[in-house]
């Protein structure tokens, strides 16, 4: 099968240098057609792993199957991130195993039960008015500037406010949260070369612990209080679990939604008919199409615990299996005209919040609401937004990130 592929020798689907320039759209489409489960060879030590490579899973049905079979495909074994900064050693990868993202059942089940109490539709809905007011303020303030960096001035703040609001983080501390989360996900990008992801994570964890101590003494109506008081089947969160959960919230909740907002606006400028439609109709289906189109997390991985097979391909115990959500979300067998941005797409069974199963994004409702509120505000106050430059992409092996995007907010540029 490999002989029929047009991939250059040594092509690596988690190579951050590729994502700094572009998404490997054509290469993934070719794999879906020719070799939907393909062995990606890697030199020993590449991206923090010494196992010689991984399986690239490109089709929607296979991504969903790997997600579902959590008894066979483990998040814990080698964590869910398919790429670490080159030079990362095994102990550093091991340290991430406390994060909910990297847990397996039954421990994952206990933790998720505790945390899910904070993400009920009612808990999320309670934030709507505050976040709507904030979204309108963010967009009005940026519009008054005339032009600027859409990522920094528009996209980044509301996702952070949503998570911080849920956690009960005081307003004066919220920019610290933003700063730490940026440092943690940008560690493969030269712009953030001075960043120390480890130090940022330590600061974030210690901030979380401090917040927990305050809430233990003075409970509030927020996520941190719920986590501190939580007891599911005799299980309370340990300090490590709590600290790493704060990291997951600050990074997973903030970075992914921010990138969806930026990439969604990029899509609207590329498909102006959809922007006209959105401004008139404000369809409820738009947020899911924005997430499908953006797929902010390009891929996560699992590791086979036993010899198994996936769509006829033999997978050995210990081999990594990387689910390319980006590919699954453009699978021609599932999505009609997948390369058309269509805000009325319904049904839209995208895997932008992860596949089905135990690790489906716990904050999906909050993300949808944040995206909705933000685009409503943009349509209200920046209906004629125009790009001034090409977006600058983040160098990352798994996050489809945009660092900067210069735009004209009022639409005077031609």
Segments the model singles out, each with a brief description of its role:
Residues 1-414:
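Cytochrome P450
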């Amino acid at each position: 099968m490999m002989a029929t592929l047009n991939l250059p020798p040594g092509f690596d689907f988690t190579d951050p240098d590729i994502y700094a320039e572009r998404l490997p759209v054509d290469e993934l489409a070719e794999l879906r057609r020719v070799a939907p489960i393909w062995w990606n060879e890697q030199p020993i030590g590449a991206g923090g792993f010494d196992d010689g490579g991984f399986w690239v899973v490109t089709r929607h049905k296979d991504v969903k199957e790997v997600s579902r079979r959590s008894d066979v495909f483990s998040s814990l074994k080698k964590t869910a991130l398919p790429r670490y900064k080159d030079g990362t050693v095994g102990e550093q990868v091991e340290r991430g195993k406390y994060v909910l993202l990297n847990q397996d059942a039954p421990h994952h089940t206990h933790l998720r039960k505790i945390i899910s109490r904070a993400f009920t539709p009612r808990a999320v809905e309670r934030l709507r008015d505050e976040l709507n007011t904030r979204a309108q303020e963010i967009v009005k303030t940026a519009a008054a500037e005339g032009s600027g960096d859409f990522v920094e001035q528009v996209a980044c703040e509301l996702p952070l406010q949503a998570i911080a609001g849920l956690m009960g983080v005081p307003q004066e501390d919220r920019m610290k949260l933003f700063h730490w989360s940026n440092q943690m996900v940008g560690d493969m990008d030269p712009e953030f070369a001075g960043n120390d992801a480890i130090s940022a994570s330590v600061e974030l964890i210690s901030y979380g612990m401090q917040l927990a101590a305050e809430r233990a003494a003075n409970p509030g109506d927020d996520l941190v209080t719920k986590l501190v008081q939580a007891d599911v089947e005799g299980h309370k969160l340990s300090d490590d679990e709590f600290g790493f959960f704060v990291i997951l919230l600050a990074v997973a909740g903030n970075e992914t939604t921010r990138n969806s907002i930026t990439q969604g606006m990029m899509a609207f400028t590329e498909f102006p008919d959809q922007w006209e439609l959105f401004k008139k109709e404000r369809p409820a289906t738009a947020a899911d199409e924005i997430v499908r189109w953006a797929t902010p997390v390009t891929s996560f991985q699992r590791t086979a615990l036993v010899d198994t097979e996936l769509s006829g391909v033999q997978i050995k115990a210990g081999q990594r299996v990387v689910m390319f959500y980006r590919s699954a979300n453009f699978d021609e067998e599932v999505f009609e005209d997948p390369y058309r941005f269509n805000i009325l797409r319904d049904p839209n069974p995208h895997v932008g919040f992860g596949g089905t199963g135990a690790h489906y994004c716990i904050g999906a409702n909050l993300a949808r609401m944040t995206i909705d509120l933000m685009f409503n505000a943009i349509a209200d106050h920046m209906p004629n937004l125009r790009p001034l430059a090409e977006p600058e992409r983040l160098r990352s092996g798994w996050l489809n990130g945009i660092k900067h995007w210069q735009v004209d907010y009022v639409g005077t540029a031609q």
